[in-house]
Amino acid sequence: MSEATIDSMLKDLPFPSNILNTLREDVLKAGVSKKEMEEIIEKMMEEYATSCIEPCDAAGVVAAQSIGEPGTQMTMRTFHYAGVAEINVTLGLPRLIEIVDARKIPSTPMMTIALSKEHPEDYAYDREKTRALAWEIEATKIDHIADVTTDLSQMKLIIDLHEKAMEGRNITIDQVKEKFNEELNVLVSISPDIDNQIVITPGEPSYRELLQLAKSIHNVTLKGIEGIKRVVVRKEGEEYTLYTEGSALRDVLQFEGVDKTRTSTNNINEIYEVLGIEAARNAIIKEATDTLREQGLTVDIRHIMLVADLMTCDGEVKQIGRHGISGEKASVFARAAFEVTVNHLLDAGMRGDVDQLQGVTENIIVGQPIRMGTGDVHLISRRVEKVEAKELEAEEE
């Protein structure tokens, strides 16, 4: 059987991608016929039907233990070289905690910038274009292109620009001067005697002002995007890709040559702000799955999807914690059982809250059967024949 035939037969099957990929590889190795393939698929569908979730099953508890148990095997290492020698990225348990805590800014924000590749001369295939785009995106500070010295006798800052560094980053002395004029309330002038030298004089001739100014000029972004500390060009297969240390999705998507459909960031809140809640949900699933897979752990994607759905179901990204999902539960006992127990009970008592005892935690606390499995099944009516039989027995007596 050809690969195209196998793909067409597997296309509409309701199985996770990792199972389909394994099946595809095994079928190609074994060289099965079309009839045998149909029998394999039929057997798989039978197994699939028997493995579906039972009514009233505790899906949330199963998801929690399915993610939590592999989580105990994850390493505590924070940094790892993600195939790019110059860029560190947080992985393992610290990264998983960041994802479920919905941190506003990850500890190592990073972007993967895919480049346009529709035509042979596009950015993805041209190293020079890619390198030029990298310099446009990377934040250029004065330290990258110049030496700064403080002249205390003249009360001035002297900036000696490096011509080669300026050429590489495609920036001119006039642009540097203009940027300092915009950002700082000082007198900026180009030295008439020495090439590529800028002289900055503070507004007030005092040592304090001069030292403050010497500190401030290092924070001015002369070119590129604020927050993108470094950009690395890497060739993957036939095309070039950019990896950044720092993240600014909205700004990066504005650049010509960036493929908007394939560019991503590991900052989930930024994805939510730029692309919306559905994109954020997909990012949570992808980041959690990739983090677990990198550690050699396989968790069924449906458990992770359940967590992602819960974090995004209200239209914004919420953490799983007392400031998010756990702190917003309707049940007083469920909130109290998680964290800051006394505060929750006191507040509920003052407000006169009523707990309907619908969930698992609150029923366990008060000693009632939980509403899961057989505990969630109630007798609604009795069969008429049995009722009539009992009535006849009562009459005979």
From Swiss-Prot:
Q: How does it assemble?
A: Part of the RNA polymerase complex.
Annotated localization = Cytoplasm
Q: Which stretches are annotated as coiled coil? A: none
Give the UniProt record's GO annotations in the biological process aspect: DNA-templated transcription
Source organism (scientific name)? Methanosarcina acetivorans (strain ATCC 35395 / DSM 2834 / JCM 12185 / C2A)
The catalytic activity, as recorded, is:
RNA(n) + a ribonucleoside 5'-triphosphate = RNA(n+1) + diphosphate
Claim: Transcription is one of the keywords in the record: yes
As for family, the record states: Belongs to the RNA polymerase beta' chain family.
Q: Which GO terms describe its molecular function?
A: DNA binding; DNA-directed RNA polymerase activity
Gene Ontology cellular component terms for the protein in this record: cytoplasm; DNA-directed RNA polymerase complex
Q: What is its EC number?
A: 2.7.7.6
Q: Per the record, a Pfam family?
A: RNA_pol_Rpb1_5
> What function does this protein fulfil?
DNA-dependent RNA polymerase (RNAP) catalyzes the transcription of DNA into RNA using the four ribonucleoside triphosphates as substrates. Forms part of the jaw domain.
Q: Does the keyword Transcription apply?
A: yes
> Any idea what this protein is called?
DNA-directed RNA polymerase subunit Rpo1C
Q: Which UniProt keywords apply?
A: Cytoplasm, DNA-binding, DNA-directed RNA polymerase, Nucleotidyltransferase, Transcription, Transferase
Per the UniProt record, the lineage of the source organism begins with: Archaea, Methanobacteriati, Methanobacteriota, Stenosarchaea group, Methanomicrobia
* Class of this enzyme: transferase
